[in-house]
């Protein structure tokens, strides 16, 4: 199911699925690779590739744009998602989605961050970008909202003074959220 879901997702995106495994070391992954190859034949219009986890980590750092949809098992997915979060500024910047056939859950990659709960230090960007992902997933009728929020986040982050503690700044959770809300209001009133 996961391979088929990855290929279906690629039809809505740039049209490429990358299988990440370590089938040269872990024999159980050869089965996963075989299933991937079988499913890829059902989606001739989608480019597919298979790479090992160590190469995937290198490419994610050096050439992140080469990826569109990555399908892998949980262990490697956890490692790659944390690496990707680091590339965009940290866990406070990384949205997350668990997407099923009919339902989906969207949340920040960092979870609830209980170690800083109630201190006003959490970066709200991951939660806000998770909302963008949800609106994208919901479809065309919510696309304008997703774009508006995404652009507001980009506008706020373009100002180097807008940084929360995790990014070396001093803005609180509320201050960062308020800055993004102000950018949304400014953008939507100008349209």
Where are these regions (language model features)?
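Short glycine/threonine-rich loop-to-helix capping motif typified by GTGT followed
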Residues: 27-37, 61-67, 85, 158-163, ...
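A broad detector of short, well-ordered amphipathic alpha-helices
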Residues: 4, 8, 125-129, 175
């Amino acid at each position: 199911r996961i391979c088929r879901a990855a290929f279906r997702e690629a039809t809505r995106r740039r049209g490429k699925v990358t299988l990440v495994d370590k089938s040269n070391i872990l024999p159980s992954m050869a089965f996963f690779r075989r299933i991937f190859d079988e499913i890829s034949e059902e989606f001739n219009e989608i480019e597919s590739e298979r790479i090992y986890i160590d190469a995937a980590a290198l490419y994610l750092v050096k050439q992140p744009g080469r990826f569109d949809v990555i399908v892998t098992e949980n262990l490697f997915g956890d490692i790659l998602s944390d690496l990707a979060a680091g590339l965009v500024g940290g866990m406070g910047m990384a949205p997350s989605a668990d997407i099923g056939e009919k339902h989906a859950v969207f949340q920040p990659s960092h979870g609830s961050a209980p170690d800083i709960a109630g201190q006003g230090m959490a970066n709200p960007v991951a939660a806000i970008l998770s909302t963008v992902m949800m609106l994208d997933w919901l479809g065309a009728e919510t696309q304008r909202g997703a774009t508006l929020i995404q652009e507001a986040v980009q506008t706020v982050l373009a100002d180097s003074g807008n940084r929360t503690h995790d990014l070396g700044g001093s803005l609180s959770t509320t201050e960062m959220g308020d800055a993004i809300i102000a950018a949304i209001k400014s953008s939507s009133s100008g349209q």
